[in-house]
Amino acid sequence: LESFKGQTPYELHGDGDTSRLKFAGTGPLPVVSVRVNGGEEVSFFIDTGGSEVGLDTDFAKELGLPNFGKVQGTFSGGEQAEVGQSRIEQLTLGDWTVNNVPVMTLPFRQLSAGLGVKRIDGVIGTTLFYHFLATLDFPNGELVLCRKTPESLAAFLAEPSGKSVAVPIWMASDHFMVGWGRVETLPPTLLFVDTGLAGGGAKLAEPIIKEAGIKLEEDKAYSGAGAGGTLKIVPYTVSRLSFGDIEEENVPGLYDGPFPWENTFGFHLAGMMGHDFFKPYAVTFDFATMQIFLR
């Protein structure tokens, strides 16, 4: 925080009302091209399960970024890893540049092959989206950033669309977007929106899996890489999963051990909804009225 004295974090520069970034690569998560501190284009994946903008540890060293120490982070399956703290002067997102951006560092390059690109140098998390009216438009393959103003929201709401569903959300901690949903025929429960859950549409806490009568497919278990290390992943299928008034059937789920945030926030969190649940939709995050729109 001391490094931002006299400066405005997340200071936006650029013309126009919208900046668009096309998705690249063929992997399971959206990847966009950005520039850090005015350098060459690099590939970042998008993960609303993450908080701050993140840079690969080696990439941060190559850029000569300051090191403000480390904290312990908790990741999938309850894995722990040290997370570095730093900052960048500029992050260029399409036509816009954001100045004075706090960042965290982790060894993200190890995820490159699984994300279908030559090299991943970082990640865009939920905290950056706070400063925009942001849309992950999966059908059209692009990230759309609009200015966070009443006028932008009014223009968005006035756009013609087919089926559009608004789901109220709350924030837990600094980046956990939580809303009401249902698992199978269980009573309504709170679920975490994690578009960075690759290869699945759900990751449920073990008690919910058991209560819903969901069967783990142990014979199809495999190893996968997470930010905290390598995990044993066991697939399963959720016959019915809903978020607000959106319901999907036969949603692929992933079990990789204890769900570490089930009882962290003073309320019960039944699990998370991942990329496969949201990919049929354009998903807009409105942090002014605290709603997610699915179109």
Q: Where are each of the predicted segments found?
A:
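Pepsin/retropepsin-fold aspartyl endopeptidases
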Residues: 1-295
